[in-house]
């Protein structure tokens, strides 16, 4: 029988290996130009300000939209506790301030989690389009898998970087979310 310390050590090794695999998968993603839509998954907003995770996602969306002028973006995220505006509106404000035409932006402002982000966003645009999922590198596997489960036939990951000590929190949380979503049939 394993001691508590040994079990803890094994769990840390499993989480570290899973985190490494998630990041390797994100780094190896190919470029997918000229998609019809990208869906930018929301993350917490502090008042009206983009948090680091959401800022990185929004910057990646900006880069993609600048490189692909025919692509439209669905900005997905409702208004949570402590948020003065929806996550979608915060992303929209940033993108418009940085030169993206408002006509290219579609706001999905009711979702409260990743599954809702994708269900509601795909419900707005339909399932028969080429779609990129813009989210942080540690979150791209789950976001893309949920999009496929929602019925999107042509879906591609578009990871944004995220470098912070908070990865020590986010990656184990993401691994648990993957397990939960798999068990609940969301993936």
What spans do the regions from the language model cover?
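A structural signal for short, hydrophobic/glycine-enriched beta-strand patches
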Residues: 19-171
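N-terminal low-complexity segments that are often proline-rich with Ser/Thr-Pro
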Residues: 4-7
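Hydrophobic alpha-helical topogenic segments used for membrane insertion/localization
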Residues: 9-19
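A transmembrane-helix-recognition feature enriched in membrane-embedded lipid enzymes
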Residues: 167-187
């Amino acid at each position: 029988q394993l001691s508590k310390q040994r079990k803890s050590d094994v769990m840390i090794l499993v989480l570290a290996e899973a985190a490494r695999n998630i990041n390797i998968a994100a780094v190896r993603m190919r470029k997918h130009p000229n998609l019809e839509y990208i869906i930018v998954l929301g993350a917490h907003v502090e008042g009206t300000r983009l948090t680091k995770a959401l800022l990185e996602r929004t910057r990646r969306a900006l880069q993609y939209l600048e490189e692909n002028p025919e692509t439209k973006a669905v900005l997905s995220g409702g208004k949570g506790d402590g948020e003065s505006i929806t996550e979608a509106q915060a992303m929209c404000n940033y993108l418009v301030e940085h030169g993206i035409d408002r006509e290219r932006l579609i706001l999905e402002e009711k979702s409260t989690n990743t599954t809702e982000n994708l269900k509601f966003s795909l419900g707005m645009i339909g399932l028969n389009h080429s779609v990129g999922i813009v989210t942080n590198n540690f979150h791209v596997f789950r976001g893309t898998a949920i999009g496929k489960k929602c019925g999107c036939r042509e879906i591609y990951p578009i990871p944004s970087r995220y470098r912070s000590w908070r990865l020590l929190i986010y990656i184990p949380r993401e691994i648990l979310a993957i397990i939960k979503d798999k068990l609940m049939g969301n993936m």
